[in-house]
């Protein structure tokens, strides 16, 4: 419980400093809690580094990164540097996490035309339905990113009309940056509800193959986004 409180205190403080909301995937941890802040974020990071295990340190770093990027750029480079040091994060792992998070945040740069947003929604929706279930967490995640909910309806229609293979071929026509971004969101949808099934993994592998995402990129995205959403290490 002490580690969870420290985790949330650090994130609440960083969110306020960088003018970010607390992201929805932390809702289950923050329910019925009054989130506090710290006057000394660096000291709190040092305490976390001494108290947390490796998985908890990684999760904290990933979620700090999620609150430290705006318009595709780091807002506070000192925060990244201090958190890498205090939490004992390997520099290469840190860069993988930051790149994965940046890929999600840069979505509005890559998807601008209405028809592209329709396809954007189709990918994560197909992933969400791969286990025959569309959870409230998955729905809230998708709604957070789209500029208009009508694109979700259009994406659902695309999913209904196409087989997974046909959908993959359609998504393959997007630009390389769009495909990589879409792969990141599909991975996030797989992790967002705290559990994933073999059917989701199979769909993801098919989608990555059809969208021609290289193994190096998909591995980096998987590692970074799993670390971001693996908040169960604090439960």
Please report, for each region that a protein language model flagged, where it lies by residue.
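Small-residue-enriched hydrophobic alpha-helices in membranes
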Residues: 1-235
């Amino acid at each position: 419980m002490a580690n969870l409180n420290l985790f949330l205190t650090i994130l609440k403080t960083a969110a306020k400093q960088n003018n970010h909301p607390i992201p929805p995937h932390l809702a289950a941890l923050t329910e019925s809690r009054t989130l506090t802040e710290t006057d000394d974020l660096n000291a709190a990071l040092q305490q976390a580094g001494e108290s947390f295990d490796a998985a908890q340190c990684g999760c904290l770093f990933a979620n700090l990164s999620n609150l430290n990027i705006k318009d595709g750029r780091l807002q506070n480079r000192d925060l990244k540097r201090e958190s890498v040091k205090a939490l004992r994060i390997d520099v290469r792992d840190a860069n993988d996490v930051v790149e994965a998070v940046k890929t999600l945040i840069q979505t509005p740069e890559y998807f601008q035309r209405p028809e592209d947003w329709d396809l954007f929604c189709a990918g994560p929706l197909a992933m969400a339905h791969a286990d025959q279930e569309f959870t409230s967490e998955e729905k809230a995640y998708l709604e957070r990113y789209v500029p208009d909910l009508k694109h979700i309806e259009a994406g659902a229609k695309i999913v209904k009309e196409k087989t997974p293979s046909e959908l993959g071929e359609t998504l393959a026509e997007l630009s390389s940056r769009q495909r990589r971004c879409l792969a990141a969101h599909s991975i996030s949808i797989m992790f967002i509800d705290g559990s994933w099934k073999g059917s989701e993994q199979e769909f993801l592998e098919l989608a990555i193959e059809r969208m021609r995402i290289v193994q190096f990129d998909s591995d980096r995205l998987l590692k970074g986004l799993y670390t971001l959403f693996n908040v169960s290490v604090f439960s």
